[in-house]
Swiss-Prot record:
SUBUNIT field: Homodimer.
Residue sites binding Mg(2+) per the record: 78, 80, 82
Protein name: Phosphoribosyl-AMP cyclohydrolase
Gene: hisI
InterPro entries: PRA-CH, PRib_AMP_CycHydrolase_dom, PRib_AMP_CycHydrolase_sf
Keywords: Amino-acid biosynthesis, Cytoplasm, Histidine biosynthesis, Hydrolase, Magnesium, Metal-binding, Zinc
NCBIfam families in the record: PRK00051.1 (NF000768)
Free-text function comment from the UniProt entry: Catalyzes the hydrolysis of the adenine ring of phosphoribosyl-AMP.
Organism (species): Neisseria gonorrhoeae (strain ATCC 700825 / FA 1090)
Principal place of residence: cytoplasm
Catalytic EC class: hydrolase
Length: 131
């Protein structure tokens, strides 16, 4: 592990840090996930975003199943050291497992959440019928 990379990062009690993926060109927030030290190290080593799945309890590379990888252009750490922003190039234009550009596709509209972004590709086409 790279000591310089990790020493400023404040991982929580579970060994995780919040990671925000933001489109490097449009600046749109595409997704928020979690990283452990291994995922952060792999991200730096490979240049592609890696995360830690809390539900599956394992490290994974974004796009390993879908092909929608995230090429990291820049890493930034916030002033408290507890959140990482990755400026990325999103392969295929789809970051969300629902087949949308962003996981933030719901918009508050006068008392209800409404879907603001269209599905670009159906989940079954991306992952097959087993997902």
């Amino acid at each position: 592990m790279d000591k310089n990379l990790l020493e400023a990062v404040k991982f929580d009690e579970k060994g995780l840090v919040c990671a925000i993926a933001q489109d490097a060109e449009t600046k749109r927030v595409l997704m928020v996930a979690w990283m452990n030290a291994e995922a952060l190290q792999k991200t730096v080593e490979t240049g592609f975003a890696h995360y830690y799945s809390r539900s599956r309890q394992k490290q994974w590379m974004k796009g390993e199943e879908s092909g929608h990888t995230q090429k990291v252009r820049e890493l930034r750490l916030d002033c408290d050291g507890d959140t990482i922003v990755m400026l990325i190039a999103q392969n295929g234009g789809i970051a969300c497992h629902t087949g949308r550009e962003s996981c933030f596709y719901k918009k508050w509209n006068g008392g209800a959440w409404e879907t603001a972004d269209a599905v670009l590709k159906d989940e079954k086409e991306i992952y097959g019928s087993t997902h």
